[in-house]
Amino acid sequence: MARPVKTPHAASQDNKPLTGKAAFFDIDGTLISTNVVHAYGYYAMNEGSLPGIVRRTLSTVAQIPLFGALNFVDRKIFNEYFYRQYEGLTEDRLLTLTEDLFEDVVKPAIYPKAKDLIDEARRAGCRVVLVTGALDFTMRPLARHLGADDMIANRMQFVGGIATGKVIPPIIEGANKANVIREYCETHGISLMKSYAYTDSSSDYAMLTVVGRPTAVNPDIRLRALARSYNWPILDVR
């Protein structure tokens, strides 16, 4: 059963040898065909009040080009800007809709061979860890469904049960994924060199270079080129 965690916290291992190994999986585009915008769109369309639904839906649609541009330029800036859209939504409502989000949006979008990839990692003796820029509560049902051991994800700040639109640091994105993976391995006695990483995006390049066994999955054009130049395995699970 999955045991999603919010963020890793580094701890001293007293110089003990790191003997374990893990498989770190990006989610959006790697295991599923949806992304964080789809998840928010679902919440916006099921907010509860008709005026709220209309306002948030129209705002989301109008900003899609901006979301795309920010995501292309800087994933960290995109995350900070995008998650402001959650401001004002209630924690209770978001959590109530989580299972519906999974059944209606996420589960149908799981790539056909994604589960096989995770099962293969488990047979190899790896601890399965999902690493995503998505909000933790949106991906918990997926982590459970896939049988992941842990999940490293972004966390929304709530004050008085209301979302502030701010993500609690550290923000899980592109280059910073390498840092949180490094911390996670240190905390859990896992060897980076024995571990695997899987992603579809060149923005996660650092995540691949921090482990000894990187794999490009459904890679974008730039990541495919990088994978070929470094002789990394290239997989298609779609």
Question: What is each stretch, according to the model?
Answer:
Residues T34-V37, S49-D119:
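A metal-dependent, Asp-based hydrolase signature
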Residues A2-D14, L18-G20, T96, E103-R238:
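C-terminal cap/substrate-recognition subdomain and adjoining C-terminal extension
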Residues Y40, I77-N79, G161-K166:
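Acidic/polar active-site rim loop that often engages polyanionic ligands
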Residues A39-G41, Q85, E183, S229:
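Intrinsically disordered, low-complexity N-terminal regions enriched in serine/proline/glycine
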Residues G41, Y83-Y86, E173, K177:
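Generic secondary-structure boundary signal with a strong preference for alpha-helix termini
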Residues F24-F25, Y43, F67, F72, ...:
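Phenylalanine-focused residue identity feature
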Residues P4-L70:
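Active-site neighborhood of HAD-like aspartate-dependent phosphohydrolases
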